[in-house]
């Protein structure tokens, strides 16, 4: 029979693509497509995410946490402004956003980054929707960054990824991806990345 509820994530991310790859075709067409997609799926977007604000490339380029937060808010504001122009209700749109952060090995700064972002998110929503009484926390996905990785002693990257993973968890992320410590064909790199997650989840208190 017909399904009344769809569970999926589209994660529309044009701004992140333009910023990461230097594409010069930035225009309003993609936002028009996004607005059209919203209206077509409106009523079926329960527990789904339509927009992904992906700032992992900033972390992988070595930018500091303040710069990452500023750019995240700038990107989010751009989406809000463009969708508001196209009559998309922001009180519904804010529930459809997910955020993806790269997490470095600066332990306390990365914890603070995620916690600060939750406060900034609430302030941003209040600025756009001052009458909104209840604001949910943003959904945050984290990926351990590779900016501090070394190729001369690759196994030391295990310490960096573990530290970054702990920061993400203590900062309050919802989803965590641990990047393998090596891209040089190390057979157990993916397994060790999985083990880091399992140890932090099941054996750490």
Q: Where are the regions a protein language model picked out?
A:
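Catalytic alpha/beta active-site cores
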Residues: 1-106, 131, 137-141, 169, ...
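Glycine-rich beta-alpha junction loops
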Residues: 57, 121, 182
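Short glycine/threonine-rich loop-to-helix capping motif typified by GTGT followed
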Residues: 63-69, 104-116, 145-158, 185-193
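Short, well-ordered amphipathic alpha-helical segments that serve as non-catalytic structural scaffolds
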Residues: 79-82, 120-124
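Conserved, mostly hydrophobic/aromatic
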Residues: 121, 171, 196
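Non-transmembrane, aqueous-exposed alpha-helical and coiled segments at domain scale
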Residues: 126-129
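Short, acidic/polar
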Residues: 158-165
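Active-site or pore-adjacent capping/gating segments
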Residues: 163, 174-205
